[in-house]
Amino acid sequence: MRRPNLDRLRLKSRQGFETSVSKPSTPSYSTYSLSPTFSDKSVLSPSTMSDSYALSSTYTAGSSYQNGESDYFGSLPTPSSDKSSTSPFPYLKGSFDDRFSSTHSLTRQPSPRSPLTPLKGNTRASPEIRYVSDFTPPSSPFEDMQASVHSLPLSGCSIGPVRTNHSSSLSNSSNSLLQTESSLRPNSSFVNSPFFPLPSSDDLFLNDRVINLFLFYEKFSYLFTHLLSAIKSRDALSIPSLVLSLQEELFNLCQQTGTFYLLQHNLLQNFEFENPIKLHFDKIIPYFSRLTVLTFSNRAFIFPDHTFPRLQQSAEDFLYHLQFFFTLCANNSLYLSRFCYYPSFVPNTPFGGKWTNNGLSAVSSAYRTRLLEPCLPELDKCVWFLLKNCDEFIENFSDFADEEYVFEICSTITSHSEQIFNKLESWDMSIYFDKDLSECEQATNFAVQSYFVTKQRCYDLLTDLVCSSQDLMMEHSNDFSTMPTMIASIAVAFQTLFENVCDFLKVRAALVDEMQELATKEFENKFSNANTAKDDEPARQTNKGTTRISRSSDFTAVSEMSKDTLTLGRNSLQSILMLDNLLTNKVVQSDNNVKGGTLPALVHYLVQNVHLNKDFRHSFLLTYKTFTTPQELFTLLVILFHELPPPGLDATAYSSWEKGDNFVTKKNVCTVMNLWVQKYFFEDLKARNTLYLISEMRTFLRDHVVPSFHIGSVILSEIDNLWTEEPPDSLTQRLLSSPMATFISLNVYAYTPEEFASQMTLLEFDYLKQIPSREWIFRSWVSRDSRSAVRNYINFSNCFTYWIINCILEKKNTKARTAVISFFIQTAYKCLSLQNFSTLMSIVSALNSAPIYRLHAAYKLVKAEDIICLSGLREIVETKKNFSTYRALLRKAELPCVPFLGVILSDLTFIDEGNPDVLDSSPHLLSFNKRHRLADVVADVCRFQSSSYEMQSNTDLQSYILHRCRFVNQDLSYLFDKSLSLEPRSS
């Protein structure tokens, strides 16, 4: 008797669960700055940079001091204290890199022109160094820093060789960094260097410290202000250094917000906000690359006149998407705050220490999951399917169940249990014992203990369930009596476990809100003081004259955005739809037609205009799966249903809003859901994701809609009807199921062309009406192995064409072949009168095929009126000018009508492949015009499917045609050779 392998489950019920968790032992890592330290605003000017530091800052390996104060720059030279300088960021005290440095293990590459001199000074050796996989490792041991060679990634430094000289003291190095006697002179290696490859290292990590996003934004504001000013004044020497500074800050932003890490490890797919974050990030990098290429593609940085407008356009495009990215991060704690403050269990993170439990060997938390909240739905889904399958097995199990069925029960339970165990084991709870979170130890102590007890209870119950299923494999063991009790206990245990985890998150959220509030107040005080000092600064001098650059300038990146928009405080905990109120051009309209927009904005427009714009409603619900998923659409509808009130409402205004706009919005959301389920729910009802979505919809409707709206019960009934609806009766399937022997002696040519044309029209229309709308949208016919209704129709049309060719060639004498040709010409003409363009096209295609077209002797005997008729039919199906004649006839055709399938498929393919998914003018907006065109084509097909023919059906003739077409010879080479044997080529 086979048993599923239980070794992989690593069951722990007999080993116990350790309830004490020690603080993770975080290893020591070398710390490096990924941004230059600006000690003087003039450092951005090329005239202040020495030749030996051509467009580059100095990066030197360092380590943490033992006295507890971290030196985030290692032995990086710093300006001398007696040097009078003005920081380019006056609201920052000291170097802003003290707050934004990253603990990244990097190495350095020597300049091809000058090797590095031995490193001296107060640099300390680190007991451990982790080398990045895509960087060059040191050529000598790290403890021996003499003559060591390192490389620095292009994503974290300036382009081109870096030359440093550490033979002098720190103060001399500092003076060397800021020496001003030489001007900027790019070299050949600099010009030919690759441009900014993004990091692809496993050592990218998520920051565990507080990130003040507004300070980042102010840095970009300052740099963009001066960059756009330099472009406007055509200050060619300042542009390269400003672009490089932007590059360094962009790397810092993506590094410290965790964007690089999440994209590299494909973790954004776990979030409902994946699309907007990834969409704007995918736009930021190309636009910045374009700006970089334009900047550094000119030798000696002599820009032609036409380059400056292109530079300005590229910079503005980059700024535009960067603002979206900033605002999106700031207003979604689900994205930014979670990675900075909340339990963040991320695989392969370089910090986190080790911890043990259940008597197992120590497992590094680098391999554990640090994203706790997104894991809850995944675990919930696994538990839900386990319980659902167990219920089905109990219901269907009997004393006479065969071995294969019992093995299926055992395998399924074992597989689901294994998934649940793996997900539970991947949760690293040691984050709650971090030294920075000591304030919440008392609050979390009870929750932690409850979590451990409940987790052990889940382990025990799952183990008992697996063992019980294993017992069924033994002879004379079919007792399922304890299964229902086990299932109920498992459900209760996991419900308690989820509640424990939610308690963790609530405690952390309260603490984080308090920390953010304090940080925000502290920053606002510094910001107000910094603005006062900044207004007293002298105007910045440029080579074109004196220009005053202030925060109210047209070039300022902050522009109309307020500080509150970018503050990570309590007010940032809002849905993504609230972001649309802060930004413009989210939905683009032309002549009352929606051309495009972001997904949340399109859903919002759908809800607000569900009764006013029926064309948009139909197009959206018909094509939504081409740009989103059912789960995401449902999530956005739920967010709109729970729409937040506008800020600042008093009790009276709130009551008015709740009874007015909010009530209408909720009612419209219910209307959209009802239409979606009733007419546009094209999902596979056997798929797991569909079952889980339907379960969520039921819960939402039962808990939130039914108590307030009667339509909630209607939608629940429609969901139940999804399984009770029977597929439409198919004439072709019934005919194909009839035996072939009945029709062997049937003579097709005993029927008139009119009768044959009418029966073919009924067959073609039956194939057409079997095609659901989703197959037109998703192009299910592309794969030849597809079993879609469109593919069945295509196969029948092709087989019918080959059958006509075989019917003509199977006649031994010329007169007989002539009679068959005339029969099908007259049939095609009758199809034209019936507006059956599909059969018409198949017949003409067969007569135009190489094996038939060359039968000149047979065509000479065809009547003149039939030849004239064939000539007119050929003009109708002529392909030139994109079937212009056929399209004109189709527009005038009245229902019922059978269109030519090939033209429909061509139009759908052209629309799908010939039109971008986003707007050319606004790449961050989805192109809804493309979806409108798809919906228009499908609407025409649905119109043809709606009206059927009222003709008598001849099942004998129809069955004969179907069976003959099913087994027809489609070897064109054989058919052509047979044609040659009947009418050899003339000499």
Swiss-Prot record:
N-terminal Ras-GEF domain sequence ranges: 590-723
Domain Ras-GEF: 752-985
InterPro entries in alphabetical order: Ras-like_GEF, Ras-like_Gua-exchang_fac_N, Ras_GEF_dom_sf, RASGEF_cat_dom, RASGEF_cat_dom_sf
One cellular component (GO) term of this entry: cytosol
Polar residues: bias regions: 40-50, 102-111, 540-552
Xref: CDD domains: RasGEF, REM
Bias (Low complexity): 19-39
Chief place of localization: cytoplasm
GO biological process, one term: chromosome segregation
Keyword Cytoplasm among UniProt keywords: yes
One GO molecular-function entry: guanyl-nucleotide exchange factor activity
Region annotation Disordered: where it falls in the sequence: 1-50, 100-130, 529-552
Localization in the cell: Cytoplasm
Modification sites for Phosphoserine: 552
SUPFAM superfamilies for this protein: Ras GEF
Taxonomic superkingdom: Eukaryota
Ranges annotated as biased composition (Basic and acidic residues): 1-10
Function, in words: Has a role in chromosome segregation and cell morphology upstream of the ras1-scd1 pathway. Promotes the exchange of ras1-bound GDP by GTP leading to its activation.
PANTHER family documented for this protein: GUANINE NUCLEOTIDE EXCHANGE FACTOR (PTHR23113), RAS GUANINE NUCLEOTIDE EXCHANGE FACTOR EFC25 (PTHR23113:SF371)
UniProt protein name: Ras guanine nucleotide exchange factor efc25
Gene: efc25
